[in-house]
Amino acid sequence: GTFAFDKGKNDYGMVVLSNESKEKGVVCADAVRFGGGMGNIARGGETSGLPRYLEGSRYFAQWAGMPYPVYSGREGKDDMSDDINSRSKMINYLSGGSIFNPEEQGLGVPFEMAMALHSDAGTSKEDKIVGTLGIYTTKFNKGLLAGGTNRYASRDLSDIILTQLQRDIHSNYAIDWTRRSLWDRNYSETRLPAVPSTIIELLSHQNFADMRLGHDPNFKFTVGRSIYKAILQYLCNQHGKDYVVQPLPVSNFSIRFGDKKNTLELSWK
């Protein structure tokens, strides 16, 4: 990619290495990479020529060092199916051996949930917002997850995320954002994970009303923060804990002389 920095030396146009640590030693960098790099997994004798973030999960899983069965369950004969399934298999391998996935061999990372963020297809003839759909799976493995939790925990996760998204988008943009539905369906990304999981179909990439916001960086920030708040709420509810949402820094800060002598008035949003 292309990474533009402001001209000259400033606080934003630099890479900083710090050796601030309790341990003695020297920190050095032989190279610095911005972004995820270019795809380097060859299929059919050549690489894609695309940045890695535009490639599928199957190729990332191989590059990340996942075991062969994780990224190539179809033995290299069906990359599309491997791409879909590798997402869940990575979660299971990473969490294997943890309290949330005790029977499966893996790296023991205690992942508590998984969320796949998608965009969906579909259009509205009335140019209305298609909106957000949540998907989960309960009819698998006798209704239980690997740690013994009821699979309806995935429904709770889906519901909390959809509710928070609808609330935050409406609050920030005064838009009646559509909450489409909650589907209990047989999808790989919600069936295979050993932990509670959901697919969030955020918006329709085919529908103009949705895409008016889809590429707005402010909208993306709102969505990202909304999902963070929803996951925080879900996890704390699971553990019976109170939670505090990380506050945002103030914006539109200004200072003006106050109405009384020798006073200043500070304001912000």
Where are these regions (language model features)?
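Pro/Thr/Ser/Gly-rich low-complexity, intrinsically disordered linker/stalk tracts
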Residues: 233-267
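Active-site-adjacent substrate-binding region
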Residues: 152-183
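Active-site microenvironments of hydrolase-like enzyme catalytic domains
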Residues: 54-155, 159, 183-206
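Short beta-strand-plus-loop segments that form exposed binding edges in beta-rich domains
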Residues: 3, 13-25
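Stable alpha-helical elements in mature extracytoplasmic
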Residues: 25-28, 49, 53, 57, ...
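Non-catalytic propeptide/linker segments at domain boundaries
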Residues: 15, 29-46, 50
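Extracellular carbohydrate recognition and processing domains
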Residues: 1-8
